[in-house]
Amino acid sequence: MLNVTLLGSGGGMPMPERHLSSLMINYKGRKILVDCGEGTQVAIRKMNAGFKSIDIICITHVHGDHIFGIPGLLSTMGNSQRLDPVTIVGPKGISDVMRGLLLSIKQLPYSIEIIEDPKGKLGITNTEQGLKIKEQKDGMNDEITVSTLELDHSAPCFGYSFYLNRRPKFEPEKAIKNDVPRLIWSKLQKGETIVAGDRKYSPDLVLGEQRRGIKLTYITDTRPTKDIPQWINQSDLFICEGTYGDNDDMDKAIKNKHMTFMEAGELAKKGKVKELLLTHFSPALKEPNFYEHNAKKEFAHTTIGYDGYRKNIEYKN
């Protein structure tokens, strides 16, 4: 299961009722942030979510409304007795930006690891030191697979996909049929390959068909692109920017490389996602719910996001 919390649903500048862009993903008590706009710390405190367990911060792009919360957050995490490294993932330029942001912070009690402009998939595993993310190799033991998509904005910008892998079901009858010793059943269930005597035992000898996991996709600060529908295909939850609610603001959306509610709904429909959650609202958009119909005309299963929105995403049988 994944638990998602929309910490900030605003774009451009903070508002009294709306912090800037940030999403928290909770997996087995450990946390991933996507973007860290101004107000993220305050939002985390409101949610009683805790700072020490944030292991990974994924940045979509380096515009201020998505990164200005980083220095304060990292400092607070240091004050919470965190000692394990924190990994920051982002597009080209993230390393230079982080060097600048870190100048404002006294020495941290933990290290910062940066993954800049990854070209392939990344794998996340849950360890005793928290969530660890690295370049994916075979993906066999990765619990979450992360992929990025280059978007169309005025700065290098990533969309993020998080796929929570689900192990095939253990089939004891299959294990017995294949003469697999009971002593190694549990290891094979975990994806390990075991050599015993003159025989090699692989997980497929005890496991059934591959089962569908959970897919969460996050896209903000972009114009619609031809690659997005396939990339978000069959997402259980598609979180997408809706900077402009009114279709009359299409010229602004094109000029500023953002999207309208209608365009987000069109992408959700083309991508055959299960649910669309809109976020990243313009400061001029005082009542996003007033324009909900513009998205729902294209995609009925649309929710207007708000600071503090929470959702559990569970496996489907």
From Swiss-Prot:
InterPro entries: Metallo-B-lactamas, RibonucZ/Hydroxyglut_hydro, RNase_Z/BN
Stretches of the chain forming a coiled coil according to its record: none
Keywords for this protein: Endonuclease, Hydrolase, Metal-binding, Nuclease, tRNA processing, Zinc
Catalysed reactions listed for this entry: Endonucleolytic cleavage of RNA, removing extra 3' nucleotides from tRNA precursor, generating 3' termini of tRNAs. A 3'-hydroxy group is left at the tRNA terminus and a 5'-phosphoryl group is left at the trailer molecule
Binding site for Zn(2+) 1: 61, 63, 153, 221
Residue positions of the active site: 65 (proton acceptor)
Enzyme class: hydrolase
CDD domains: RNaseZ_ZiPD-like_MBL-fold
Residues that hold Zn(2+) 2 according to the record: 65-66, 221, 280
Protein name as it appears in the record: Ribonuclease Z
Gene: rnz
